[in-house]
């Protein structure tokens, strides 16, 4: 079959039905960009798989497509993390469980406060945990809410203002009916 790629860039450390993110499909991937749950100070990421052939292909793609030195068996990229970023991720990984616990505590408080003022938000089901890589809310007047939060010193962002199906590179591939949901 076709391998399923799980994008866990925002959810590294979360779980679904007792299984950790990056472990729910054929290939799991995450980002170590600074704003992510396990972020370094620069850029980086990781791919997880239990399939030996996929793992080998990923290793080759990561080093310009080389299967052995000076032999390029596929098209690849320079996709290696530098040692400083690796050291940062490894150090942060040692306290990652503590950080997740802190995120869960803060997320529960946000949920309580947002419920009190009537915001619509993502409801957390009992068979999964979030690490609150992003905290998404739905409101009638986004600009007014952002302005009020800004005045109170609370940062906000519209993280993906142009939906993927409207991006020029993908517009011809995607379903236009997706847009109303992504804009909600």
Give residue ranges: language-model regions:
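Short, hinge-like loop/turn segments at secondary-structure boundaries
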Residues: 20-24, 47, 174-177
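Histidine-centered beta-alpha loop that forms part of the nucleotide-sugar donor binding/catalytic region
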Residues: 9-10, 33, 43, 59-63, ...
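A short helix->loop->beta-strand "cap" motif at the edges of active sites that frequently abuts
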Residues: 1-2
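PLP-dependent aminotransferase class I/II
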Residues: 15, 50-184
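Adenylate-forming
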Residues: 40-44, 89
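Short aromatic/hydrophobic contact patches that present stacked aromatics
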Residues: 29, 46, 134-136
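Conserved active-site segment immediately N-terminal to the catalytic lysine
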Residues: 6-39, 68-73
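Short beta-strand-to-turn element immediately C-terminal to the catalytic PLP-Schiff-base lysine
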Residues: 22, 31, 45-51
């Amino acid at each position: 079959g076709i391998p399923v790629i799980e994008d866990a860039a925002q959810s590294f450390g979360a779980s679904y039905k007792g299984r950790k993110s990056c472990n729910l499909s054929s290939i799991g991937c995450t980002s170590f960009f600074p704003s992510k749950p396990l972020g370094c100070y620069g850029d980086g990421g990781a791919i997880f798989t239990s399939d030996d052939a996929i793992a080998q292909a990923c290793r080759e793609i990561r080093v310009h497509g080389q299967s052995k030195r000076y032999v390029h068996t596929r098209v690849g990229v320079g996709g290696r993390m530098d040692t400083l970023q690796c050291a940062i991720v490894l150090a942060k990984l040692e306290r990652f469980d503590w950080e997740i616990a802190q995120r869960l505590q803060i997320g529960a408080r946000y949920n309580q406060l947002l419920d009190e003022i009537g915001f619509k938000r993502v409801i957390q089901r009992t068979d999964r945990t979030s690490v609150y890589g992003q905290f998404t809310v739905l409101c009638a007047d986004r600009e007014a809410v952002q302005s009020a939060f800004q005045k109170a010193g609370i940062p906000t962002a519209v993280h993906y203002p142009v939906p993927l199906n409207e991006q020029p590179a993908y517009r011809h591939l995607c379903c236009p009916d997706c847009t109303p949901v992504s804009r909600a």
